[in-house]
Design a protein with these regions (language model features):
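NAD(P)+-binding Rossmann beta1-loop-alpha1 motif at the extreme N-terminus of oxidoreductases
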Residues: 1-51
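NAD(P)-dependent Rossmann-like dehydrogenase/reductase catalytic/cofactor-binding core
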Residues: 217-220, 224-308
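Hydrophobic anchor at the start of a short beta-strand
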Residues: 3, 25-26, 97, 118, ...
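Active-site-proximal catalytic alpha-helix in oxidoreductases
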Residues: 175-203, 207-220
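Helix-loop-beta segment of a Rossmann-like dinucleotide-binding subdomain
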Residues: 133-143, 193-203, 258-269
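Rossmann-fold dinucleotide-binding core
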Residues: 105-183, 187
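N-terminal glycine-rich dinucleotide-binding loop that anchors FAD/FMN and/or NAD(P) in oxidoreductases
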Residues: 43-60, 185
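Rossmann-like NAD(P)(H) cofactor-binding subdomain of soluble oxidoreductases
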Residues: 52-135
Length: 308
């Protein structure tokens, strides 16, 4: 099975490295100085919480030609970059396309590629890229699947990830999963912008963290009331006191440790365009469905000098 990972940021590099180490025939599409660095010195990934740095001699390309044949292409780009690659994907012969990352317009994106088998995924890794390496935490867990009602891709996913160290969650309704993910991460991004990327400023601010949870609940309520599922299923009881307590513990941990920088503020501060677009599009979803989200709007206003 030939696999292309299209995009060499933190998520793409971790995905390519993990597939490569499992013996998969994987190629990484990178650009500019970063492509040359990988070609010359290998893909270097430093684990944030250990002294270990892996070096992987992964084949690198800089373009996707129409006749380049792969069994699957993982598109690992920012939400704001996806439209720019659609023509390239349309003209390429590969049928199976997996979009990895934030997305609140999954159904529209799949409709834009009617001749393809379009899947979506979200991988649990985070960090930042330096000139000669990636520094990250990689939990080796990926949620992947198609839109509700689409043909099953269980066999394909099993073939891709068989023999890897990934914990794979096969999700039959990735549209709703990604909507819910956006409703969770955007309030956290507002917190990053409020503190100029230093979440430790909020470690004792339980009132503000409570508002972050309130905004998340507003988002989930809007999604549920519009007829969508709350996913993962563990979040279905999002209006319960148990859910609030679990979220508060999580956000306090994020604000008190380096996890906040690595898992939230690094990306939020370096991907303001993506977070702005994600916020814009999920608010459009809220408005189209007549949802009220006053706490969300208040947090957004406090982060306004960053959002575009």
């Amino acid at each position: 099975m030939k696999i292309l990972v299209y995009g060499a940021g933190v998520l793409g590099c971790n995905l390519a490295r993990n597939l490569f180490h499992a013996g998969k025939d994987v190629t990484l599409l990178a650009r500019g100085n970063w492509a040359e660095e990988i070609r010359k010195n290998g893909l270097r990934i430093k684990d944030q919480f250990s002294l270990r740095t892996s070096v992987s001699r992964i084949p690198v390309v800089t373009t996707l030609a129409p006749d380049a044949a792969y069994d699957v292409i993982f598109v690992v780009l920012r939400y704001t970059q996806l439209d720019s690659v659609l023509d390239t994907l349309r003209t390429n012969r590969t049928k199976n396309i997996v979009f990895v990352g934030n997305n609140v317009q999954a159904r529209a994106l799949a409709a834009a590629l009617p001749e393809k088998n379009v899947l979506f995924a979200f991988a649990l890794s985070a960090g930042h890229r330096e000139p000669d390496r990636v520094v990250s935490i990689d939990l080796k867990k990926i949620t992947i699947g198609q839109l509700r009602g689409a043909v099953s891709n269980a066999e394909l996913i099993g073939e891709i990830f068989g023999g890897t160290k990934y914990k794979v969650v096969y999700e039959l309704n990735m549209e709703d999963y990604l909507l819910c993910h956006a409703a969770f991460v955007m309030p956290a991004a507002f917190a990053c912008y409020k503190t100029d990327g230093d979440l430790k400023k909020l470690r004792r601010n339980t009132v503000y963290l409570g508002r972050v949870i309130d905004a998340n609940i507003e988002g989930y309520r809007a999604i549920r009331n519009a007829g969508h599922d709350i996913l993962p299923k563990a979040d279905a009881d999002f209006e319960s006191e148990k859910y609030r307590k679990t979220c508060l513990r999580f956000f306090k941990l994020m604000c008190a440790t380096s996890l906040g920088k690595l898992c939230a503020s690094d990306h939020a501060m370096n991907a303001i365009d993506e977070m702005s677009a994600l916020n814009r599009d999920i608010k459009q979803f809220f408005d189209e469905n007549g949802a009220a989200y006053p706490v969300w709007q208040a947090l957004e206003a406090e982060a306004g000098r960053y959002l575009r």
